[in-house]
C-alpha cells in the first residue's frame, strides 16, 4: 500500500495496539463469547497487517478462512454451552495463573531473542532458487504456492501458530 510514512507508522501502531488488546481480551475475559469476539479482532487486525504489507491474497485468505469460518465456528460452539457458570466465582489472579504467566513470558522472551538473532534470509526455504521461473507457464495456484513457500513463509507459519494457540485456548475454555 502506498502510504506516506507517518500514516503508515500510525496504522502500524494502531493495529499493533488492536492486536495486543484483542489478545489480552482472549486471555483475560471470563465470558467465552467475549473471548471469541476478541479473537475475531486479533484475526482482523492481522489481516489488516497483511494489507499494509501488500499481501492482499494472504489478507483475503485470513479473513475468509480464519475470521469467516473458524471464528464463527468457535462462537457457535461457545453459544451451545451453559453460559451462567462463567460468572460465578471469578477470580482474576490465582497462583497457577502466576506460574503460567511466568512460563509464557519466559517462552516469549526466548522466542523473541531467537527470532531476532536468526538470519532468515540464509534459510533455504525462505529464499527463491536461482532458477528463472517463467510466470507464463505457471498456473495461479502454483504461483500462490511459490509465494507462500518463499515470500510469505514466515508470516504464514506465524499465523498457523497463532491459530493453533487460539484453538487450544478455545478448547480449554469449552471444557471448563
From Swiss-Prot:
It catalyses: a plastoquinone + NADH + (n+1) H(+)(in) = a plastoquinol + NAD(+) + n H(+)(out); a plastoquinone + NADPH + (n+1) H(+)(in) = a plastoquinol + NADP(+) + n H(+)(out). Its main location: plastid. The keyword Plastid applies. The keyword DNA-binding does not apply. Signal peptide: none annotated. The chain crosses the membrane at residues 10-30, 32-52, 61-81, 92-112, 152-172. It is found in: Plastid, Chloroplast thylakoid membrane. Belongs to the complex I subunit 6 family. This is NAD(P)H-quinone oxidoreductase subunit 6, chloroplastic. It comes from Solanum lycopersicum.
Amino acid at each position: 500500500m502506498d502510504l506516506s510514512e507517518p500514516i503508515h507508522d500510525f496504522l502500524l501502531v494502531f493495529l499493533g495496539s488492536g492486536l495486543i488488546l484483542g489478545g489480552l481480551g482472549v486471555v483475560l475475559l471470563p465470558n467465552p463469547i467475549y473471548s471469541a469476539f476478541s479473537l475475531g479482532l486479533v484475526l482482523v487486525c492481522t489481516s489488516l497487517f497483511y494489507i499494509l504489507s501488500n499481501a492482499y491474497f494472504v489478507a483475503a485468505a485470513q479473513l475468509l478462512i480464519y475470521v469467516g469460518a473458524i471464528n464463527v465456528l468457535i462462537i457457535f460452539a461457545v453459544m451451545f454451552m451453559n453460559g451462567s457458570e462463567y460468572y460465578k466465582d471469578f477470580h482474576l489472579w490465582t497462583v497457577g495463573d502466576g506460574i503460567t504467566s511466568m512460563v509464557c513470558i519466559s517462552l516469549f522472551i526466548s522466542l523473541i531473542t531467537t527470532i531476532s538473532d536468526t538470519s532468515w534470509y540464509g534459510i533455504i526455504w525462505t529464499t527463491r532458487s536461482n532458477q528463472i521461473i517463467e510466470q507464463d507457464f505457471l498456473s495461479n495456484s502454483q504461483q500462490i504456492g511459490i509465494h507462500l513457500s518463499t515470500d510469505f513463509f514466515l508470516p504464514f507459519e506465524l499465523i498457523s501458530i497463532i491459530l493453533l494457540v487460539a484453538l487450544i485456548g478455545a478448547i480449554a475454555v469449552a471444557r471448563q
